């Protein structure tokens, strides 16, 4: 089975070799028929401490690194949101 890959924004990089990534999903509400946004935070392993707050990154499923970390940063995929908007 292929590993899931999610795209999100780094909201914290204060921990050593760990980042917190906010992943947003959109879906249509079954009754109201309105597009709803829901977000969830994932702890991901960042071996080289490469990702910084505000960057858009891709994370993929992996073996458990700790109690909360079961995702890892996909190398070479970090993109700075502030630089692309300016």
Curated annotation (Swiss-Prot):
Q: Per the record, what is one GO cellular component?
A: cytosolic small ribosomal subunit
Residues in the signal sequence: none
Q: Which InterPro entries match?
A: NA-bd_OB-fold, Ribosomal_uS17, Ribosomal_uS17_bact/chlr
Gene3D superfamilies reported in the protein's UniProt record:
Nucleic acid-binding proteins
Which domain of life does the protein's organism represent?
A: Bacteria
Spell out the molecular function terms from Gene Ontology.
rRNA binding; structural constituent of ribosome
- Is the keyword Ribosomal protein assigned to this protein? yes
Q: Which UniProt keyword terms apply here?
A: Ribonucleoprotein, Ribosomal protein, RNA-binding, rRNA-binding
**Any one GO BP annotation for this protein:** translation
Annotated Pfam families: Ribosomal_S17
Segments forming a coiled coil = none
Which NCBIfam families does the entry mention? PRK05610.1, uS17_bact
Family listed: Belongs to the universal ribosomal protein uS17 family.
What's the stated role of this polypeptide? One of the primary rRNA binding proteins, it binds specifically to the 5'-end of 16S ribosomal RNA.
Q: How does it assemble?
A: Part of the 30S ribosomal subunit.
- What is the name of this protein? Small ribosomal subunit protein uS17
User: Organism, per UniProt?
Assistant: Methylobacterium sp. (strain 4-46)
């Amino acid at each position: 089975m292929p590993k899931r890959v999610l795209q999100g924004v780094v909201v914290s990089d204060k921990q050593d070799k760990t980042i917190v990534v906010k992943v947003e999903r959109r879906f249509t509400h079954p009754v109201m028929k309105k597009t709803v946004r829901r977000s969830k935070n994932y702890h991901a392993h960042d071996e080289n401490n490469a990702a910084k707050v505000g960057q858009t990154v891709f994370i993929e499923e992996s073996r458990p690194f700790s109690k909360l970390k079961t995702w890892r940063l996909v190398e070479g995929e970090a993109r700075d949101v502030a630089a692309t908007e300016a």
